Amino acid sequence: MRKVAKLIGISLLALGLAACDGETKDTKAATDGAAASAPAGQQVSLLDGKLAFTLPVGMADQSGKLGNQANNMHVYADSTGQRAVIVILGDKTADSLETLAKRLENTQRARDANLQVITNKALDVNGVPLRQLDSIITSGGEKAYSSVLIGSLNNNMLTIQVTLPADNQQQAQTEAEGIISTLKLKQ
């Protein structure tokens, strides 16, 4: 599962670096009516409160081990590393959110021919347009549920990835939606 976490981290980093050349504009924003219940856990606040969400019980800040303030990567994971939330802030891009999501999907597909895309949709969180790409990825014979949110916040490109074991896809999807439903953004 460490390989999956590394693969996901590298994919997100590559996406962030590939999209460092302009301003993101996307006019296709939909409201996400996810009815997933919010998990009880630790409240996380970044960018002076402009980005906040709730971690599920059992996850803790691992940024000192895998990321730091200098590289704008924040990592929250459980003790096994199988359940993780990764937040990356990068430079804005001129590419649309749809283009960025498609590029991410193509990158994941190049690494995993068996990639299963569950969702690729537009959503809106507190007036901030985002793109959500949910998929099942396989690495080292293990499957993981990945939910990636891409958007623009505070003159940064924002990428949030929730990774969970995909042994039970419905449970993983519900837990990911629960985390996403706690997301609060302020421009």
Write out the residue ranges for each language-model feature.
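Secretory pathway targeting signatures of secreted, lumenal, and periplasmic proteins
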Residues: 52-97
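Signature of long, low-cysteine stretches enriched in small and polar/charged residues
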Residues: 105-151
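Soluble non-cytosolic domains of exported or imported proteins
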Residues: 50, 94-99, 166, 170-174
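C-terminal motif of bacterial Sec signal peptides marking the signal peptidase cleavage site
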Residues: 16-19
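Extracytoplasmic/secreted envelope proteins and their assembly/folding machinery
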Residues: 56, 97-105, 147, 173-180
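N-terminal "mature-domain start" segment
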Residues: 28-70
